[in-house]
Regions:
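Acidic interhelical loop/turn segments
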Residues: 21-37, 104-138
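Alpha-helical transition-metal enzyme core signature, strongest for iron centers
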Residues: 10-17, 40-55, 84-86, 92, ...
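Hydrophobic secondary-structure block in the mid-to-C-terminal portion of proteins
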Residues: 124, 128-163
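Short, solvent-exposed segments of well-ordered alpha helices
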Residues: 1-4, 34, 38-41, 93, ...
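Long, hydrophobic, amphipathic alpha-helical segments used as structural scaffolds
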Residues: 55-58, 62, 110-117, 153, ...
């Protein structure tokens, strides 16, 4: 996949997510999920946090600290929980701003990347990442991630939390 194709795929799937979010009112964005956990606004923060992780990867910074975690956990569920704990009381506006700012900053960096950049191996602290190229975390933390959360958000809307 060329760099332009990567960016086009990111932009298309991101727009699908943004369009979905635009159909949800404030009450829907802040209501807990069917299991009583993450609200839709928490999904936005989560996506933004992983975009911060990806941005830090390209900038050579500590990815976990860039997400706002303690940097002391390395299991994905623990990382996600730390991010949620830190941001769960954020307002809808704060969650949106975090989501939008992370994406803007990431896309500014990705705009400069070439196909060769995406094809280079990347260093990772995750055990299962040996030998993967930069395209793998780019896909996993952008268009594949958006698609995953689009599905969950649609499920949440179909089956809201019991009040």
């Amino acid at each position: 996949m060329t760099a332009d194709e990567v960016r086009a795929r990111i932009n298309a799937k991101r727009q699908e997510l943004v369009d979905l979010i635009a159909t949800i009112d404030a009450a829907g964005l802040s209501a807990p999920g069917p299991d009583g956990s993450w609200a839709i606004k928490d999904h936005l923060v989560h996506i933004g946090a992983w975009e911060h992780w990806l941005l830090a990867l390209f900038e050579g910074r500590n990815e976990l600290l860039a997400m706002g975690t303690s940097g002391e956990v390395n299991e994905v569920d623990d990382i996600n929980n730390e991010v949620w704990q830190r941001h769960r009381d954020d307002s809808i506006d704060e969650a949106r701003r975090y989501f939008e700012d992370a994406h803007r900053d990431l896309m500014a960096v990705l705009a400069e990347k070439t196909t060769e950049d995406f094809d280079r191996p990347y260093p990772s602290s995750f055990d299962n990442a040996a030998g993967l190229t930069f395209l793998t975390p780019v896909a996993a933390n952008t268009y594949e991630h958006y698609d995953e959360h689009i599905g969950w958000i649609k499920e949440m809307r179909a089956k809201p939390a019991q009040r």
